[in-house]
Regions:
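Double-stranded beta-helix
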Residues: 341-343, 368-398
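Short acidic-glycine-tyrosine-enriched beta hairpin
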Residues: 338-363
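Conserved Rossmann-fold NAD(P)-dependent oxidoreductase catalytic core, especially the SDR/UDP-sugar
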Residues: 85-124, 137, 142
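NAD(P)H-binding glycine-rich loop region in Rossmannoid oxidoreductase-like domains
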Residues: 44-82, 86, 90-93, 107-114
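NAD(P)-dependent short-chain dehydrogenase/reductase
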Residues: 131-183, 188-202
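N-terminal Rossmann NAD(P)H-binding glycine-rich loop of SDR-like oxidoreductase domains
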Residues: 1-26
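Mid/C-terminal beta-alpha module of Rossmann-like enzyme folds, strongest
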Residues: 197, 201-282
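A short glycine-rich, His/Asp/Glu-containing loop-to-beta-strand
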Residues: 274-315
Length: 398
């Protein structure tokens, strides 16, 4: 399959081309049915001759080209409708009935606040041109009316989310005029997966009730139904949590598929390189060090413990707190004793064979570095964040 992507250097085009190449080059094996040979990338710096060649050879076309911030309103029609006409005429010239996808906009509904949108009118005209082309040629046409897109793009240009991410990550001032303003957002990775579905003939169809997407198996339009409705206030509050994470160590809740998970990934792409690395507080004494790495609201914390040669650490027990000790370097011994029955167990542990050992509530425990020359490095997970007002930790030698 040869694929033409117009607008290949835009936000969507860049992400789509990168991921199409992953499939073509065998780096992404999750879509075995897709056999991609060539990816033709067309953008503003391409030539008419290249477009002519690509339209002759393409088996599938993603038309992402268009304008959304022209200097003059009339340029909307020229940039969105005009290029669409050129593309379809070029395909007709070569009698190429390749499937073609059109990136349109929710503004093309011309409903609600979009009623007077010049951009929406130009997109609507492009849609009708594509539907007419499908009737005339019999080619499959897939028209997507995208909501606000969420991906790495130029800040202070066309995306409030990108602007907020950039501002928070770079300590720049920003203004939220109305925290209650709601956006419907489509994340770039979800969009790309939707395009893979289209390539495989598994796209979802819809109609529109005003600006609301209504799934319908025989709908005129196609859609990627995985969107998120969030307020500006919710977005900036999450971003402030992300910014504070290196200091608080608290990782915000980010369930699989959640908006927070996607926003955090996007936020990180705006970090300046001098923020890629940040210091952690090492609690150092003559025995070694103890450093907390990550806190979570639901699952406690993760830490790194370093014990110098011959050192014993621990010698305490907990009522309800529990831990996992995972030695990743060095050679050590973990001992535990039930404070009620006196039963004892011990485990020899080594970074050469990584194992996890439970520290059981009601069992006093320690960890001993058996080496005379090497540090013992242990990852320690705990089911709760340390609370000095309720430490649940009691000294008791094993």
């Amino acid at each position: 399959m040869n694929i033409l992507v117009t607008g290949a250097k835009g936000m969507v085009g860049t992400a789509l081309c990168n991921n199409l190449k992953n499939i073509r080059d065998g780096k992404n094996k999750t879509h075995p049915a897709l056999d991609i040979k060539e990816i033709y990338e067309y953008d503003l710096d391409s030539t008419p001759a290249e477009l002519d060649e690509y339209c002759q050879k393409a088996d599938f076309v993603f038309n992402l080209a268009g304008v959304n911030r022209p200097e003059n309103p009339e340029d909307f029609m020229k940039g969105n409708f005009g290029f669409a006409s050129d593309l379809l005429n070029c395909l007709k010239k070569h009698n190429n009935k390749a499937t073609i996808m059109l990136s349109s906009s929710i503004q093309a509904t011309l409903a609600g606040r979009f009623g007077n949108s010049e951009y929406g009118r130009s997109k609507k005209a492009g849609e009708e041109l594509f539907f007419q082309y499908a009737q005339e040629t019999g080619a499959k046409v897939a028209v997507y009316r995208f909501v606000n897109l969420m991906g790495h793009s130029r800040p202070k240009y066309n995306s409030a989310v990108s602007t907020f991410c950039w501002a928070v990550a770079n300590d720049e001032p920003f203004t939220v005029n109305d925290r209650s303003t709601e956006l419907e957002l489509l994340y770039i990775d979800d969009l790309v997966e939707g395009m893979f579905d289209l390539l495989e003939g598994k796209e979802q169809h819809c109609e529109f009730d005003g600006v609301e997407t209504v799934l319908k198996a025989d709908g005129r339009y196609c859609c990627v139904p995985v969107t998120h409705k969030v307020t500006l206030g919710e977005i900036v509050d999450l971003l402030q949590e992300f910014k504070a994470q290196p200091t608080t160590l608290m990782m915000p809740k980010m369930p699989d598929g959640s908006f927070a998970k996607k926003l955090y990934s996007l936020y990180l792409t705006y970090l300046p390189t001098d923020k890629f690395k940040y210091a952690l507080k090492m609690n150092v004494d003559n025995r070694g060090s103890f450093t907390e790495l990550v806190h979570t609201a639901d699952c406690g914390q993760v830490s790194i413990n370093i014990s110098k040669p011959g050192i014993t650490k621990g010698q305490h027990w907990h009522n309800s707190k529990w831990e996992l000790f995972i030695v990743v370097a060095g050679h050590g011994l973990i001992q535990e004793r039930n404070i009620n029955t006196g039963e004892t167990v011990e485990f020899e542990v080594s970074g050469d064979k990584i194992e996890a050992v439970h520290m059981i509530p009601g069992w006093t425990h320690n960890i001993i570095n058996l080496s005379e020359t090497e540090n013992l490095v242990t990852v320690m997970t705990c089911n709760e964040i340390f609370n000095p007002n309720h430490p649940d930790t009691f000294f008791e030698p094993v």
